[in-house]
Amino acid sequence: MTMDEQQSQAVAPVYVGGFLARYDQSPDEAELLLPRDVVEHWLHAQGQGQPSLSVALPLNINHDDTAVVGHVAAMQSVRDGLFCLGCVTSPRFLEIVRRASEKSELVSRGPVSPLQPDKVVEFLSGSYAGLSLSSRRCDDVEAATSLSGSETTPFKHVALCSVGRRRGTLAVYGRDPEWVTQRFPDLTAADRDGLRAQWQRCGSTAVDASGDPFRSDSYGLLGNSVDALYIRERLPKLRYDKQLVGVTERESYVKASVSPEAACVIKAASAERSGDSRSQAATPAAGARVPSSSPSPPVEPPSPVQPPALPASPSVLPAESPPSLSPSEPAEAASMSHPLSAAVPAATAPPGATVAGASPAVSSLAWPHDGVYLPKDAFFSLLGASRSAAPVMYPGAVAAPPSASPAPLPLPSYPASYGAPVVGYDQLAARHFADYVDPHYPGWGRRYEPAPSLHPSYPVPPPPSPAYYRRRDSPGGMDEPPSGWERYDGGHRGQSQKQHRHGGSGGHNKRRKETAAASSSSSDEDLSFPGEAEHGRARKRLKSHVNSDGGSGGHAGSNQQQQQRYDELRDAIHELKRDLFAARQSSTLLSAALPSAASSSPTTTTVCTPTSELTSGGGETPTALLSGGAKVAERAQAGVVNASCRLATASGSEAATAGPSTAGSSSCPASVVLAAAAAQAAAASQSPPKDMVDLNRRIFVAALNKLE
C-alpha cells in the first residue's frame, strides 16, 4: 500500500457499533436504568411515529461538546437492548489518530491473522473501547414518558469513552457497517435490515475540512486519556463486556483482552537488519578502519530474552574476529559509554584491530538506548584491563594501584597487662596504614592507658581482710556440715568471740525467733475431737525433716522418703479418728434409745444397770434386762465399731452366773467381763494383718482399748 493510499484510508470514515444499554443487565446506579418500554416510547416520540431517529445525534469524545467526531447513523431497540451504529467522519480527529497510532507499540503488533492491518481502527479500539449514551433520567416512569419540561429531547448525544458505565456497552470499530453489525451474534436478520435502512437513509459521506465539527486538539484528547488511566476496573469490565456481547466468538479489532505488557518485550533483531542499520546510522571517525566482517553477538544476558545488537560508537568500532577462533567460541566485544571503557577494545582486541582517535566525542558519553548485561567478574576484569590504557587516552587520569590495601591485624582477645609497654593512638594509626614494627612489643598494644598511681604522700591502703567462718552451735557439735556455718566480715573483729557466739547484742536471736514465730501458725495444729483425753489442747503436727534451703544430693532423697512415710501415717491416724468419731456418735444414739437411763462417760458407751433394778424386776431375768445390750451387739456385728470394745451376744446362764452387784453401785462387772471376752474372741477371729498400715491400725486400736 502506497503512502497516498494510506492517507486516503486514514481520512475515510470509520463505523462503530455497540449496545448503549442491555435490558437483561441491571446497572449499579438507579439513574442509569433504561427500561424497554421507556426506550421504545422515546424512539417513537423522537422518530415521529417510527422506531428510529429522525435527526442524527452527535458523536463525541468523552461527552465533550467541542470534540464532536461524527454522528449516529442508526439507533434501534432490539431484543437484548438499545443498539446504535455511529460514523466517525472528522478529518482532523482521524489525522491525530493516524499519527498517534504510528508511535504505539501495541498497534504495531497488528490484529488477528485473518484481519487486515488498520492502525486507525486498532488505535480507536484500544483507546475508546466503550459507548455511553447521554439521555434523560427515567427514575420515574411517568416523568420519563412525558416530554414536557425544559428538555424535550430524550437523547442528547452518544460518546466514545474508555469504558461505559452500563454493562455490555462494548464498541466495535470497522470500515464496513455491514461487517460491524455481523460482529454481534445477538442481532437477528431483521435487526440488521432495520439498521441498514437507517444508515442508508442517513448517509455516511465524508466531511470536508471546512465543515469539521471537531474543535478540540490533541491536548484535549491527551487530557481525556490521562483521566481514563484512573479508572481502576476498566480492563476487568471490558473483558466482561466482551464475553457478554459475544464478540470473542468472531474476529474483531477489540483489544479488551490483550495486555499491553507483552508489547514491551525487546525483540531480537536479525544480523542483516542490525548490520544495515549500523552501516547507515554510524559515521566512522577519521582514520578508523571499518571491519569487513559482521560484528560478533553481544554477551548473552541471564534472562531468556535476547537483547538487540548494540550500535557501534563513533569513537570505538568492534574488532574483527581473529582467524584462530573456532565458530563455537565467538569473540566478545562490547562498547560502553563510561570514559574508562574507551580503552577496553584496545586492550582486548586482536593485533589486527585499530582504535579510533585519541579523544572521544561528546556524543559518545551519552547513555545508549539499549544496554548489555555483563557478569560482575567480567565487568571488573574490563575495568582492570582499561587501567593501563586510561592515562594514555586521557592525560591527567590517575589509575588506582592494582594491589589492595593490606588488611589490619586482628585485635587481641584480652587486654594486655599493666606490665606491657604503653602504645599511643598515633602509633596504632601508623600501624594500620604503614609497615610499622614495634621493637619492644611484637603484637598489638592495649587500647587503654595504665591505671594512675597514688600520690606518694598518701598512705598505702591496708590489704583486704579475708573472710572467715564461725560455727553457729557449740564447739561440741561436729556433725553439722560447713554449709550451716555463719560468715562474718572483718568489720566484726573488734567484738569478742563470746559475744559473737551468744548472738552479740541479741539481734540475731531476735530475728531467728521472729522467723520461727511467723512460720508457726494455727494450720500446724492437729485436729482433736470431743471425748478425747487431749481435747482442747493444742497439738502440733509431725513436721517433715527437710532443710530450709531444700537440701541437695542424698539428703534430699532421704528427706523425701521420710516425708512420704509421715504422710501415710498421718492419713492412717486421721482415718482411725474419723472411724472412732463415727462409732461414738452411733453408740451415743444407741444408748439414748435404751429403756433404762444409762450413765455415759466421755470414754465409753457401755450400758450398766444397778442391782436393785435387777432384783426388783418382778420375775424378769437378766437376759431380758440385757436385751438392749444384745441389740448393740447385733449392730456391732453388722459393722458398727465401738471405741471401747466389740459387744457380743451373752446367753442367759452367763448373765445369771455373773451374780447381782451391790446396791447403789453404778458399775457393771458382768457387762465388762462379757465385753472383754467378746473382744478376745473377735481378736482371735480376725485375719492376719495385710500390710504395715493395717498392723499399725490394730496396735493403735488395742492401745486405745487399754486406755479405756
From Swiss-Prot:
Residues 333-352 are annotated as: Interaction with pAP. The active site is at 63 (charge relay system), 132 (charge relay system), 157 (charge relay system). Its EC number is 3.4.21.97. The record marks 143-144, 209-210, 275-276, 643-644 as: Cleavage. Disulfide bonds: none annotated. The keyword Endoplasmic reticulum does not apply. It is an enzyme of class 3 (hydrolase). One of its GO terms (cellular component) is viral capsid. Residues 498-513 have a biased composition (Basic residues). A motif (Nuclear localization signal 2) lies at residues 537-543. Residues 294-311 have a biased composition (Pro residues). InterPro entries: Herpes_virus_sf (IPR035443), Peptidase_S21 (IPR001847). Residues 270-339, 455-565, 593-620 are annotated as: Disordered. Region of interaction between pPR and pAP is called Amino conserved domain (ACD). The region of interaction with major capsid protein is called carboxyl conserved domain (CCD). Belongs to the herpesviridae capsid scaffolding protein family. This is Capsid scaffolding protein. It comes from Human cytomegalovirus (strain Merlin) (HHV-5).
